[in-house]
């Protein structure tokens, strides 16, 4: 246990000088006991000086304070004692319910599983959300990204997925709140408590108001807890809200560490940092991690380096579109932009595949005809095109669905739609069985039978 002293403090970056024979290693944790602050070593500058990032506010620090080297990376509690608790980046409880009382602690920096230990993900995971199950099905042990700009419903979709999967799937879940609103964290905690699944969820928060060090490392803290459950042979769910804030924290830290920025001001190590995190989120022969990650898209630009780097790592991408949200269709998933590796006749079966492609084909044709309709009106279309447009508008409305977590706001009870019913319903619309129903009947209903009932009342 060597001791050093602080020599320079610039925001969240603190330089510490140690005796030359006992310089701490990169990623080792240091403690400033006077203020109870943990630092993480990022660079060795030579002459016994290391550059560190503070895992907390650096207010009240001054030069010459004593710093202790713990001789190991940051470690956090793992295991069943973390369930039902809210912890911060260091694994300290923040829910005022006493110590975690863990039996084991793991380092947050770990190697990704070896290539021969990985197992492919092909089993489907039903979410009960029509548009997702039909167009971009999720795999058990797969990685899913929810992409969307500000205010199109990433967090609400995430909450609904957690509600549907966590209540239907009886395993453990870990939720990492990375740089999101504290209010959402609080809402989420109460949502879990009310649906009686809190005792199966570990919550790790590093919110918007935290220093960049916390936001950069909190994703790793949550991931480490999920990895422990996976190594025990369980199938665990990992929710991360929001991956973009992880990148953003990296950008803030990178600038403070004095690195040259790359495109759009991001850190030069963007792809590597993303890879280090994403390669650990994977399924092995022992157990699986199914991860659902919200990805904020700055200014609705999917080609921005941050979302673009995330795309490469995912099995399924659910793209939320502002144009669809403007029509009042929620979930605002874009069925033409969202993709999934699972949408393959060998995995989902021929019928599901054909129905999904027919739905997309109809919507694509409608999109192409929109300009003609805007200029010349519906009357100028051929009979066949009129029918396509009418069906596409029904499909578009039928892709909306009332959510359980949004009941309070919408006043309509949530619906969980099994995959079989989803496929049959859309097959019927595409084949023209419901051409006689008005399109309003398809808006905000669960199954097709509800649409038929609704049509009778109109």
Swiss-Prot record:
Its main location: membrane. It is found in: Cell inner membrane. It is a peripheral membrane protein. GO terms for molecular function: ATP binding; ATP hydrolysis activity; proton-transporting ATP synthase activity, rotational mechanism. PROSITE patterns: ATPASE_ALPHA_BETA. It comes from the Bacteria. InterPro entries: AAA+_ATPase (IPR003593), ATP-synt_VA_C (IPR055190), ATP_synth_F1_bsu (IPR005722), ATPase_a/bsu_AS (IPR020003), ATPase_alpha/beta_chains (IPR050053), ATPase_F1/V1/A1_a/bsu_N (IPR004100), ATPase_F1/V1/A1_a/bsu_N_sf (IPR036121), ATPase_F1/V1/A1_a/bsu_nucl-bd (IPR000194). Signal peptide: none annotated. Coiled coil: none annotated. Its EC number is 7.1.2.2. It catalyses: ATP + H2O + 4 H(+)(in) = ADP + phosphate + 5 H(+)(out). One of its GO terms (cellular component) is plasma membrane. Keywords: ATP synthesis, ATP-binding, Cell inner membrane, Cell membrane, CF(1), Hydrogen ion transport, Ion transport, Membrane, Nucleotide-binding, Translocase, Transport. ATP binds at residues 148-155. Transmembrane segments: none annotated. Gene3D superfamilies: 2.40.10.170, Bovine Mitochondrial F1-atpase, Atp Synthase Beta Chain, Chain D, domain 3 (1.10.1140.10), P-loop containing nucleotide triphosphate hydrolases (3.40.50.300). Belongs to the ATPase alpha/beta chains family. F-type ATPases have 2 components, CF(1) - the catalytic core - and CF(0) - the membrane proton channel. CF(1) has five subunits: alpha(3), beta(3), gamma(1), delta(1), epsilon(1). CF(0) has three main subunits: a(1), b(2) and c(9-12). The alpha and beta chains form an alternating ring which encloses part of the gamma chain. CF(1) is attached to CF(0) by a central stalk formed by the gamma and epsilon chains, while a peripheral stalk is formed by the delta and b chains. Produces ATP from ADP in the presence of a proton gradient across the membrane. The catalytic sites are hosted primarily by the beta subunits. This is ATP synthase subunit beta. The lineage of its organism: Bacteria, Pseudomonadati, Pseudomonadota, Gammaproteobacteria, Chromatiales. The gene is atpD.
